[in-house]
Design a protein with these regions (language model features):
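Conserved SAM-binding loop
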Residues: 7, 34, 82-84
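CheY-like receiver
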Residues: 43, 51-120
Length: 120
């Protein structure tokens, strides 16, 4: 049985690229859904269980930090990985302090590095 991933990002190109990054059928992971912001992600999670959330930080309506806080307030134990183009140390620290399990820079993403982060 594969682990279910929810991708939260407001950029359609990122969602398409994420799907095409690797042959997901050859991994223990399935991209089961996407959301365009934190609020959409919370609505998705009300109806669909997932094992891992990968989220961007900067989004309208509810950003990634807001999503992390909302999940932690609901005592969620779903691991959250931040996938962002921002390398600012303060943003990284804020995400990890809020409860993110990991932080990946979009510029550094490859199929191998993503799978390595997911395997942690």
């Amino acid at each position: 049985m594969s682990l279910q991933i929810l991708l939260v990002d407001d950029e359609p190109a990122i969602k398409i690229g994420f799907r095409q990054l690797t042959d997901w059928s050859k991994t223990p992971y399935t991209l089961c859904g996407t959301a365009g912001n934190g609020k959409e992600a919370l609505a998705y999670l009300e109806k669909n269980p997932v094992d891992i959330i990968i989220t961007d930080l900067k989004m309208s309506v509810m950003d990634g930090i807001g999503l992390i806080h909302a999940l932690k307030q609901n005592n969620s134990e779903i691991p959250i990985i931040v996938l962002s183009s921002y390398s600012d140390f303060e943003l990284v620290r804020e995400a990890l302090t809020a409860g993110a399990a990991d932080y990946i820079l979009k510029a550094n993403i490859s199929a191998d590095s993503l799978i390595a982060h997911l395997d942690k």
